[in-house]
């Protein structure tokens, strides 16, 4: 009831608003009102003999508000008249048609008509009409790429409804719209990616034909778990992972949005838990209050008049561990009913949000969906995963019945959770806490219960499992219990991090010496100042060395340290106190106190073998590295080619005439040019000049160096060859002229002396002048 109705009621004399909390205590399930859900389907290969019920809602039409529609996991939907009772000795199952070929997650009645829409896991939503005693399908709406999770009609328009699915899309449908070219229903408005981010369903990146456009890579789509219309132009939605409730203005065309659509208002998650997903949304009759079931075991109430991000109330006490738990309001809007994962359903008085008013116990597993009828007896329906649904009615008081009679006649009873005298109207209602015995009737988590027990004086005392260090000493700690009280552990003086091993006995004694208090009765203030200055002159190292360790592991150490002589009486007193260790309760012992102290002894066996130090890396640039590599390569062993190059360099240093003579006598490449020259001057037979030059060009490629050498020595080689060839030519002429032409056996021609040219080119004929 809103504030306006309250003011009008006060004007008419009805100032005191009365409730019926006492009547809810008498809710019970008679044996005739316990049903076994819908009969299972036989078509599915995964046969489930007890399919759970996912949705149950009463009709929203006058004269038929006692009709209940329920849908199960097999895709079956059936109608039940809640005024009829089951008079059979056993629980009976209802018979319903096969409406979908997958689970039906939600259904919603049209306002003022006997029509309802169903949302299924087969990616479709279907419109049904009640005809006689059965249902008839009117149309199928295909637009989602994943399971359709929720559906909602406009508050006063039975022709427009909205659907939300696991693909993150919210589709607005108008049953009066024309069909598409493929005779499918046309979407009136689309809100794609309404709830993105969080642990939602990842989007597939493979290419496929879908009606829902894909989002950018790396983003996730949060499933649409709840839809509710505030009015005909305002739609409210919630997601499974983003933790935000969004308010959409349907007068905008969200279909034309290419980027993420922007809602008109946002209501972020108001808690501090990581379970921030919402499972269900309901709006009261006035349209000013929004109730949202959250995964953090809380139902949040928001003010829709101002869209404040801070909730008005937080209804606690349930256990919400799945996305199938739903809630509803009473017909008068004064009470809130919700399912729970602890096998119960809970009813809250909206004026007291701290804890539930009544708990309905009768199911054996999680209670998922609930419904509150508006007929004359206001029945309550609870559905569970045990494939049972129970109808709760207000009956007689059961306190006078025995346990056997109650178990025989009833299948569910209600019990108070909140105490009226202390909780509802008491001044200290906010300080009420639970004890361990209340765990059976209160769905509190164990952690929350233990936190409450810490702050409750009369509750079970919490015992710590931690032991102090003195308790772990065992016998040594027990000896001191009789003489003195256990003291708290002293705060360490050093400000650095904690040490892995405790301090040695010497260091403990030194610390105890520093913490020794000075008795004011022993000396005057001036004398105490002198003694303090003298005590400061004694270094802590000398104090430590004055009390050597008596560990058996350090007996082989021959070093004996003695403290330097002091003339001060205060220093001697300090040294005497160091020899007397403090009592066990005041000192802190360590398991390593008797081990050798290599720092004080000055020697350690592991320090003799030290790994060599690494040479520091020299910082040299890349140019210097290249220069060093060239120098190192020059110092390597000399190869045969390098020796030949050194000999050529030695020849260059000789005189030009000596170089020409060496080249003319030894180089075979230089004699190739006179062959070409002789062949040009020779008019007789022999190898043609063209073929000789061609073969030479193939065997000896012409380079700038070789051409330069040939040009420099051409003249010198020409005269040297002419000189060597002129003398043998004269001898051959005189020899050939001696025999006659008639001699049948002419003497053999004696070959001239072999020259380098004739030896290298035996096929070349030397012409005579």
Curated annotation (Swiss-Prot):
Modified residues (Phosphothreonine): 201, 456
GO cellular component: cytoplasm; nucleus
Modified residues (Phosphoserine): 204, 459, 524, 655, 679, 691, 711
Gene Ontology annotations of biological process type: mitotic G2 DNA damage checkpoint signaling; proteasome-mediated ubiquitin-dependent protein catabolic process; protein ubiquitination
Tissue expr: Ubiquitously expressed during embryogenesis with no sign of tissue specificity in expression up to stage 17.
Entries under InterPro entries matching the protein: G-protein_beta_WD-40_rep (IPR020472), WD-repeat_CDT2_adapter (IPR051865), WD40/YVTN_repeat-like_dom_sf (IPR015943), WD40_repeat_CS (IPR019775), WD40_repeat_dom_sf (IPR036322), WD40_rpt (IPR001680)
Entry's localization field: Cytoplasm
Biased composition (Low complexity): 689-704, 728-743
Keywords from the named record: Cell cycle, Cytoplasm, Phosphoprotein, Repeat, Stress response, Ubl conjugation pathway, WD repeat
WD repeats: 99-129, 143-174, 194-249, 264-303, 320-349, 362-393
Any GO molecular function: protein-macromolecule adaptor activity
Compositional bias segments (type: Polar residues): 503-518, 546-562, 657-666, 705-714, 758-769
Disordered: annotated segments: 196-221, 448-467, 476-562, 655-769
Family listed: Belongs to the WD repeat cdt2 family.
Function description: Substrate-specific adapter of a DCX (DDB1-CUL4-X-box) E3 ubiquitin-protein ligase complex required for cell cycle control. The DCX(DTL) complex, also named CRL4(CDT2) complex, mediates the polyubiquitination and subsequent degradation of E2f during S phase. E2f degradation is necessary to ensure proper development. Substrates require their interaction with PCNA for their polyubiquitination: substrates interact with PCNA via their PIP-box, leading to recruit the DCX(DTL) complex.
UniProt name for this protein: Protein lethal(2)denticleless
Source organism of this protein record: Drosophila melanogaster
Gene: l(2)dtl
């Amino acid at each position: 009831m809103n504030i306006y109705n309250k003011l009008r009621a006060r004007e008419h004399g009805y100032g005191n608003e009365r409730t019926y909390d006492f009547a809810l205590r008498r809710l019970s399930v008679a044996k005739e009102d316990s049903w076994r859900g819908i009969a299972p389907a036989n078509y599915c290969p995964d046969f489930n003999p007890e399919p759970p019920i996912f949705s149950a809602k009463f009709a929203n039409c006058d004269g038929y508000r006692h009709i209940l529609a329920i849908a199960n996991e097999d895709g079956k939907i059936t109608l039940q008249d809640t005024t009829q009772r089951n008079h059979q000795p056993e629980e009976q199952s209802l018979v319903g048609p096969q409406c979908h070929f997958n689970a039906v997650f939600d259904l919603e009645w049209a306002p003022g008509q006997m029509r309802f829409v169903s949302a299924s896991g087969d990616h479709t939503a279907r419109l049904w009409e009640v005809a006689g005693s059965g249902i008839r399908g009117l149309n199928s709406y295909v637009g989602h790429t994943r399971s359709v999770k929720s559906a909602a009609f406009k508050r006063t328009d039975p022709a427009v409804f909205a659907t939300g699915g696991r693909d993150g899309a919210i589709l607005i449908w108008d049953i009066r719209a024309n069909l598409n070219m493929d005779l499918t229903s046309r979407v009136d408005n689309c809100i794609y990616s309404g709830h993105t981010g969080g642990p939602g369903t990842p989007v597939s990146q493979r290419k496929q034909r879908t009606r829902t456009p894909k989002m950018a890579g790396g983003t996730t789509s949060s499933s649409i778990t709840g839809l509710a219309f505030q009015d005909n132009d305002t739609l409210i939605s919630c997601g499974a992972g983003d933790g935000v409730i969004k308010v959409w203005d349907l007068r905008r065309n969200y279909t034309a949005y290419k980027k993420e659509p922007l809602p008109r208002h946002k209501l972020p998650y108001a808690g501090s838990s990581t379970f921030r997903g919402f499972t269900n949304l309901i709006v009261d009759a006035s349209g000013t209050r929004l109730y949202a079931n959250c995964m953090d075991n809380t139902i949040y109430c928001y003010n829709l008049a101002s869209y404040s991000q801070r909730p008005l109330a937080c209804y606690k006490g349930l256990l919400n561990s799945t996305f199938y738990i739903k809630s509803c309001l009473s017909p008068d809007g004064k009470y809130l009913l919700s399912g729970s994962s602890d096998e119960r359903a809970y009813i809250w008085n909206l004026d007291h949000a701290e804890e539930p008013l009544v708990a309905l116990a009768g199911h054996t597993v999680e209670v998922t969906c609930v419904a509150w009828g508006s007929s004359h007896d206001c029945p309550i329906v609870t559905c569970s995963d045990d494939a049972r649904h129970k109808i709760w009615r207000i009956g007689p008081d059961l306190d006078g019945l025995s346990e056997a009679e109650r178990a025989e006649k009833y299948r569910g009873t209600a019990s108070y959770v909140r105490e009226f005298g202390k909780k509802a109207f008491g001044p200290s209602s906010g300080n009420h806490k639970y004890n361990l015995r209340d765990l059976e009737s209160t769905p509190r988590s164990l952690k929350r219960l233990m936190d409450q027990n810490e702050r409750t004086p009369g509750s079970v005392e919490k015992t710590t499992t931690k032991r102090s260090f003195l308790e772990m000493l065992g016998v040594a700690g027990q000896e001191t219990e009789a003489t003195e009280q256990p003291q708290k552990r002293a705060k360490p003086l050093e400000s650095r991090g904690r040490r892995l091993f405790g301090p040695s006995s010497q260091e403990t004694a030194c610390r105890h010496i520093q913490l020794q208090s000075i008795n004011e009765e022993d000396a005057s203030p001036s004398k105490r100042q002198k003694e303090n200055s003298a005590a400061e002159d004694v270094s802590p190292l000398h104090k430590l060395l004055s009390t050597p360790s008596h560990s058996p592991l350090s007996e082989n150490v021959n070093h004996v340290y003695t403290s330097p002589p002091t003339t001060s009486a205060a220093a001697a007193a300090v040294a005497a106190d160091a020899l007397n260790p403090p009592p066990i309760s005041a000192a802190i012992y360590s398991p390593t106190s008797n081990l050798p102290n290599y720092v004080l002894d000055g020697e350690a066996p592991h320090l003799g073998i030290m790994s060599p130090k690494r040479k520091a890396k020299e910082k040299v640039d890349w140019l210097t590295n290249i220069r060093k590599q060239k120098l190192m390569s020059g110092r390597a062993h000399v190869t045969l080619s390098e020796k030949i190059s050194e000999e050529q360099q030695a020849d260059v240093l000789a005189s030009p005439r000596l170089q020409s003579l060496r080249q003319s006598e030894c180089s075979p490449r230089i004699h190739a040019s006179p062959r070409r020259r002789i062949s040009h001057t020779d008019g007789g037979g022999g190898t043609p000049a063209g073929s000789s030059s061609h073969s030479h060009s193939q065997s000896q490629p012409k380079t700038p160096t070789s051409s330069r050498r040939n040009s420099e020595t051409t003249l010198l080689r020409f005269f040297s060859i002419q000189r060597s060839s002129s003398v043998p030519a004269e001898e051959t002429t005189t020899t050939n002229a001696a025999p006659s032409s008639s001699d049948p056996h002419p003497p053999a021609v004696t070959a001239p002396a072999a020259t380098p040219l004739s030896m290298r080119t035996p096929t070349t004929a030397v012409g005579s002048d």
